[in-house]
Structures are given as C-alpha cells and as structure tokens.
Amino acid sequence: MTEARPIILTCGEPAGVGPELAPKALASGVPFVFLGDPRHLPEGTAWAEVTAPGEPVADGVLAVLRHDFPAPARPGQPDPANAPAVIEVIARAVDLAMSGAAGGICTLPINKEALKRGAGFGFPGHTEYLAHLAGDVPVVMMLASTTVQPPCRVVPVTIHIPLSEVPLALTPLRLEQAIRITDAAMRRDFGLAQPRLAIAGLNPHAGENGVMGDEEARWMAPLIERLRREGFDLRGPLPADTMFHPAARARYDAALCAYHDQALIPIKTLDFAGGVNITLGLPFVRTSPDHGTAFDIAGQGIADAESVIAALRMAHEMAARR
C-alpha cells in the first residue's frame, strides 16, 4: 500500500451532529481536512484554515477548507438558506477527490428533506448524487462492520423502495451489476485476490424449491451459475436467516442482499456504532458514518464519534490501495 493523501470530511447538515463530530474525529489519527463553515464548529474548537488538503497544521488542530454558509447553524433546526451550500460542499469535495488532491471523501450526514425544501435537491441521497457527479456511473452501497469478527459486509441490491416493489426491482441485470461492482471493489479497495460473495435469496428459506416463491430457482440460481463459470466465487442463493451468524460469515467476504432491511438489520445489530457506509463503483473513495443527522441530540456535545472515526480510517485504508 502507498501513503494515502488526506481525506475530505464534508460538513453535512450544519444543524445536525456533523459540526461537533468533526473535531472529535481527530482521534482517528487519519490525515483529513474538514470542508465547511468553521463558524458552525463547537465553541472552543481549535482549527486552522488551509487552502489545500495536506497543508500542515499543529497537532490537535482541525484543518479547515473554508466554505462559507449564508446562515448560522441552529442545532436541530435546519435552515433552508443553507441547503445550496451543503450541496456545493459535496460537489467541491468530489472535485478535490477526482483531481487527485485528496485521497477520498468521508461525508457527514445530510438531511434530504431540508435540501429538497431549500434547494430543490432531486436525489434520494448522497450515494445517488455522488454517482451523478462522477458521470452517472453505476454504484452500490456497502455497509461494513469494523468491530466484529468475522467481518459483516452487506450490499443491498435494492435500497430505498417499498417492500412491495422489491420483487419487480430485483432483476437479473441489477443483481449481476451489483455482483460485478462488489467483486471489483473487494479486489481493489479491500485487497482480496478472490472475493467470496454470498447471495441471499429473496424469499423465506430462499424459496424452498419453489414452495415459497420461485425467483431463486427461476433466475437467481442460473445467473449465479453463469457467473461462477466466468470465475466469480459465489455461493447462493442462500436463506437470509442463516447467513449472518459467525460461522456463516467466515465462509464469505461480503453478502449481497435482496432488499434494504435484509442487509441493514444484521449489520446494525452486530455493529451499530462501528458500521461504515461505503459507495462501491465510484472513481474515488467515499465512506460515511452509518447514522443520520441526529437532530434530537445536535449541539449537546454528546454525539458518539465512533462511526465517523471508523469511516475515516476505512477511507484512509482504501485510498492507500488505489
């Protein structure tokens, strides 16, 4: 691995816990720079303005790439006037990562409702917007544990849609694309020469030979067999309810799940505080803490930094492999 360039930590929604997490993230030991408005940081934060990632600052001082916002941060009360600046920060971070000035980005949480209300934000979330900024590349979301062994890494093949729509949205093309993106990312970003991927069935007991649904037998198993012949190390379709105990996780490196809760319930149960959100398929590294803006505790100084610290460390490790 090579020495990675600094990570950009975007400010996220300034009315959330992002501003108080930034100085706490110095405990990660990872070189990073905060991109946002320093006026939103907690009172007493030691910070120094830099003009480019990597400019030296004193130990224990937060390096800040300044991006001024039009309104102050009121904890728990997002201001629509700040929405355009939140979006600009994300785009600026992507420019820095794609130009090579930064090793990657770690994004603090945004509030989609506030962005839509204040700036007409037309994307479901960070992931889709980042894919758009990168040239509308196909991406998948991975959630990865950092404190449990064997690791739990999950990829929901369908994400933010009603459960009733999953059977139609889970297509052979979508699953194949997710397998290919995940396999490539596990090789490049996790250093695995032959990633082992487990594929969860859609139905209870993976359909139980068609008794509880036929998607597994009708098209999932044939797709998996075809990709095996190409050289992919795949197992499945597997019953999802027995995929996540320690002995099962030891048999694969990442699990592809049919829908949101099938993937996120196990990761959040096993490693709620230490989970990291990773976008696979981008031309740059992107991670984020696995939590939201937490308006209910914003500004109180009690937000747990474990997930953002884990996300920064993972971004740093991934960037060092690129």
UniProtKB/Swiss-Prot annotation:
A divalent metal cation binds at H160, H205, H260. This is 4-hydroxythreonine-4-phosphate dehydrogenase. The keyword Translocase does not apply. GO terms for biological process: pyridoxal phosphate biosynthetic process; pyridoxine biosynthetic process. Belongs to the PdxA family. It is found in: Cytoplasm. Its EC number is 1.1.1.262. It is an enzyme of class 1 (oxidoreductase). One of its GO terms (molecular function) is zinc ion binding. It comes from Paracoccus denitrificans (strain Pd 1222). Pathway: Cofactor biosynthesis; pyridoxine 5'-phosphate biosynthesis; pyridoxine 5'-phosphate from D-erythrose 4-phosphate: step 4/5. Its main location: cytoplasm.
